[in-house]
Amino acid sequence: METSIQQLQQEIDGYQIRNAKELEAFKLEFTVRKGKIAGLFGQLKTVDSADRPRIGQLLNALKLSAEAKVADAESLFAQNAETEAPALDLSLPGRRSFLGSEHPVQKVLGDMKRIFTAMGFGIATGPELELDEYNFDRLNFPPNHPARDMQDTFFITRGQEEGDVLLRTHTSPVQVRVMLDEKPPIRVICPGKVYRNEAISARSYCVFHQLEGLYIDKNVSFADLKATIYSFARQMFGSDVKLRFRPSFFPFTEPSAEVDVTCYLCGGKGCRVCKKSGWLEIMGCGMVHPNVMRNCGIDPEEWTGYAFGMGVDRTALLRYKIDDIRLFFENDVRMLSQFMA
């Protein structure tokens, strides 16, 4: 028995393991449950009881020797695999990163700015948190006007000495600040975010973007206003766009009008979006009310002017033929990615 152990030890020591295939063959021959080492352990019961402890120690040493040879071979193969791994190929092209896109509302707003600045309008901005004085009083809103009610306006504080503080309901306060700070002639557009306490639906939202325009000079007429709006509409919606002006009322303009374009979905035939009328409103406009000019320190006997205002989000709906304004505020990448340049 001792001689057999010595012979098997010599076989293990002399066994060459150069690859994974030879390693697997070594395991099958020596270390598996039916291998040579296990066979010798099976013969241990035939050994004289006096010699059995010593022979058992020799067998355990033989088993450990075989297991150590397997472990050394596996470690060596693992190291070789790491060193033989292909190096980083710096000539390979980089992975293309995902590029976002400009939001459709911002795209439309950018186009609006370019159109009006090409006409000679400057750009003015102001605070979104406003005083009642600039949002209503100086714009000729009477004290009992519905817009002053909490059902329509987000008030921050009320009854303060400096006046009520609110989230602006339009960008007209920017026009007021411009008229107070600058002398005519004035030609500006006022883009920005506005807030109204409205029910959220496919056509309205509690926060949206607005662009208003103001032009004050000598002998400005309603014909000048119409020419400006026609020029804008053709550049924004195409040369074949049709417009109509409807008489309306706004506290800050007189006379006042609302401007409609043919419905983008039905082409003027009438559908759900245009409420079967064939027209969609895009803006309000009119000649600046004399009271507004007086409130801002401008003499209406010397100067005249026009103003207009439109929803940027609604204009984006028209341009891209989208029927739900809420899509602009959900930040759904599936929708926004359609507007990549």
Swiss-Prot record:
InterPro entries on file: aa-tRNA-synth_II, aa-tRNA-synth_II/BPL/LPL, Phe-tRNA-synth_IIc_asu, Phe-tRNA_ligase_II_N, Phe_tRNA_ligase_alpha1_bac, Phenylalanyl-tRNA_Synthase, tRNA-bd_arm
The keyword ATP-binding is assigned to this record: yes
A cellular component annotation (GO) from this entry: cytoplasm
Requisite cofactors: Mg(2+)
Record keywords, A-Z: Aminoacyl-tRNA synthetase, ATP-binding, Cytoplasm, Ligase, Magnesium, Metal-binding, Nucleotide-binding, Protein biosynthesis
Keyword Ribonucleoprotein carried by entry: no
Enzyme Commission identifier(s): 6.1.1.20
CDD domains given in the database record: PheRS_alpha_core
Spans through the membrane: none
Domain of life where this protein originates: Bacteria
GO BP annotation list: phenylalanyl-tRNA aminoacylation
Localization: Cytoplasm
GO molecular function: ATP binding; magnesium ion binding; phenylalanine-tRNA ligase activity; tRNA binding
Pfam families per the UniProt record, alphabetical: Phe_tRNA-synt_N, tRNA-synt_2d
Quaternary structure (record): Tetramer of two alpha and two beta subunits.
Protein's name according to its UniProt entry: Phenylalanine--tRNA ligase alpha subunit
Lineage of origin: Bacteria, Pseudomonadati, Chlorobiota, Chlorobiia, Chlorobiales
